[in-house]
């Protein structure tokens, strides 16, 4: 069953020889959150047949006096190159990394004899978390809110400075004419998802033009999943979360943004056929992985 879903989801990628597959994957406390071995996280990456992965929550965690740093072993098991961005962010690549920005936010990757792309990866700040604020779910010492204006204000307070730093680096490498990718757990939904149409359908409480995704859109970064699946009501593409609490607000927080190339497919890897295009069971993370396929 899993194999059949995999073949369907990957068919648009496999028949295009100039395709590069890019994924975003929050591995949940360096694989410790799901209480499964690191090899299960590697299986998720392997099942997607991806080429480049932005990893979030790869921090070294200590449990029972033992320090866990599983990302290097995952990269080695897959035969991938590894770039440590710091602060728990990693970029894994089937292709060699040949350069990086001074900030280490992004790397230049050689995907062919004369073909290069830039890959950025981020994990934007997690609190305050506006979907909880809007829905009366306690999370940190922050007030509940009711309006789009309040949601945008708190989102900017939490993430705007970091978004601006990434924008500057991305705009700089764009000048070279290369394809550019940005993966990440934004800890903030997309302005393409929380539309008035989605609010009218009861999917989200109100319309919100979320500022992080909007800011990247304004510099020419496109949302690959929403490009392939433009209907935010019929195909919400939830990546948060495979392990919902009773009060959970399901959402799409994990993104593969792109510029300078064409997206041909985008799919979700997760825990079940009901939620995902590619299934890995047991599933090791509290975020589903998103993978997109590109031609350049």
Identify the residue ranges that each predicted region occupies.
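N-terminal, active-site-proximal structural segment of metallo-dependent hydrolase catalytic domains
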Residues: 2-3, 9-76, 116
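Loop/turn elements at helix/coil->beta-strand transitions in domains of secreted/extracellular proteins
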Residues: 17-21, 48-52, 78-81, 113-117, ...
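Stable alpha-helical elements in mature extracytoplasmic
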Residues: 37-41, 49, 67-74, 88, ...
């Amino acid at each position: 069953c899993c194999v059949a879903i995999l073949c369907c989801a990957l068919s648009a990628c496999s028949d295009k020889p100039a395709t590069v597959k890019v994924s975003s994957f929050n591995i949940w406390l360096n694989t410790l959150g799901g209480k499964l071995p690191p090899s299960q996280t590697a299986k998720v990456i392997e099942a997607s047949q991806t080429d480049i992965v932005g990893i979030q929550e790869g921090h070294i965690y200590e449990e029972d006096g033992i320090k866990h740093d599983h990302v290097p072993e995952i990269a080695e098991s897959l035969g991938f190159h590894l770039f440590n961005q710091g602060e728990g962010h990693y970029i894994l690549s089937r292709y060699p990394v040949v350069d990086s920005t001074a900030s280490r936010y992004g790397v230049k990757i050689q995907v062919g004899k004369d073909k290069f792309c830039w890959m950025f990866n981020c994990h934007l700040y997690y609190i305050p978390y506006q979907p909880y604020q809007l829905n009366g779910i306690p999370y940190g010492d922050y007030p509940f809110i009711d309006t789009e204006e309040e949601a945008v204000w708190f989102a900017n307070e939490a993430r705007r400075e970091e978004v601006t730093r990434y924008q500057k680096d991305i705009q700089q490498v764009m000048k070279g004419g290369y394809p550019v990718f940005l993966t990440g757990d934004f800890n903030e939904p997309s302005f393409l998802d929380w539309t008035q149409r989605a609010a009218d359908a009861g999917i989200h409480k109100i319309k919100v033009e979320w500022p992080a995704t909007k800011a990247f859109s304004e510099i020419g970064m496109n949302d690959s999943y929403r490009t392939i699946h433009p209907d935010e009501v019929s195909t919400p593409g939830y990546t948060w979360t495979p392990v919902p609490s009773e009060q959970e607000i399901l959402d799409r927080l994990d993104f593969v943004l792109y510029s300078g190339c064409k997206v041909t497919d985008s799919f979700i890897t997760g825990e079940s056929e009901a939620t995902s295009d590619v299934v890995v069971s047991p599933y090791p993370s509290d975020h589903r992985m998103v993978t997109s396929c590109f031609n350049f």
